[in-house]
Amino acid sequence: MPDIRPALQQAWLTQGLIARVLWPVSLIYGALVWLRKLLYRLDVFHAPHLPVPVIVVGNVFVGGVGKTPLVIALVKQLTARGLKVGVLSRGYGRSGDGSQSVTAQSSATEVGDEPVLIARACQVPVFVGKNRLQAGQHLLAQNPQIQVIVCDDGLQHMALAHDLALCVFDERGLGNGWLLPAGPLREPWPVDRSGYLQVITLSTSNYEIENPQRVNEQLLGKEEEQLQVQVQVLEKDKEKPKELKKPKADFVVPRVLADFAQQADGTTQALSIFCSQKVQALAGIGKPQVFFDMLTDKGIVLLATKALADHDDMRTIHIDPELGEVLCTEKDAVKLWNFQPTAWAVPLITEIPEELLNTILAHIGPKLSSAHGHQTT
């Protein structure tokens, strides 16, 4: 059976024939989304709070948009500020649904590739679970020192209340602006959650940012419990559909390739060395071509590339050793290293701007827990 995902993803960028045919179905989907939100608003469905602040890093554009590097950067920088941070994730692609602890040695098959990557990169407690509330409770029970929780994805998971949301966009923005399946949106934009929205722009260094707006001092004075902070990833893309819709943005959070690559045994090598070697690359992220372009911009000549779908099974791919060394993302390496330990993972590095970090801390500050993990009063 042919894979229709590429055609559908392309159709989501314009309001063309395929999107228009699917548009009536998106009305039904939209009605269900609206009804679900209404039931939560009327407290028919209850969204409990955990005793520590919960920051959600999510998206409304379905699929991979570059959340994980942002999650890793946020966790590291909150930790550098002296906070004890824990991470929750759904663990997409894993074999089970129950709540489970994740370590650097965990199997991606059992817990998902992104949670393993976060555990390895951040060295903080990580839990996965379809029920994010239950996973959060288990996380805090086993790690009572935790003061703040970062959720990797979960913007639409309303069963767990959150205190702050970072909504990530890539260069596709809102696509054609329509809901699934006629468009790429999981829910209508702007997100109707607290009535107050801000947009933060996350960009790679090789893309020219157009009119980024900064969050101003008035933002710090808002009293809304659930500030929705939106993040837009602007990436290199020469052919942007004319109908592409983009939200306004507030912050630029650069994302660049590291200057080194690493193998499964910890061996590292300067990325510049690959400029004079035979190299092939693969990527199973939301926009694989972006990773390939970033390697090319470093002067690396790629003899072949393999663009895989987000969370694809690495066991099914064929790697030709005649095409040279294999470069991949850290996320792909979590699974690829199980049978290709000599592959080189190239980290994507993101740094949260100081202004954005201060804004985040200002909004979660009133609920920050004590050193023993109990909510302050």
Model-derived features: where do they sit?
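Conserved beta-strand elements of the Class I
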Residues: 86-88, 167, 279-282
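A transmembrane-helix-recognition feature enriched in membrane-embedded lipid enzymes
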Residues: 2-53
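Short, high-confidence coil segments that cap the C-terminus of an alpha-helix
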Residues: 83, 143-146, 162, 276, ...
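Residue-level signal for inorganic ion chemistry
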Residues: 28, 68, 118, 152, ...
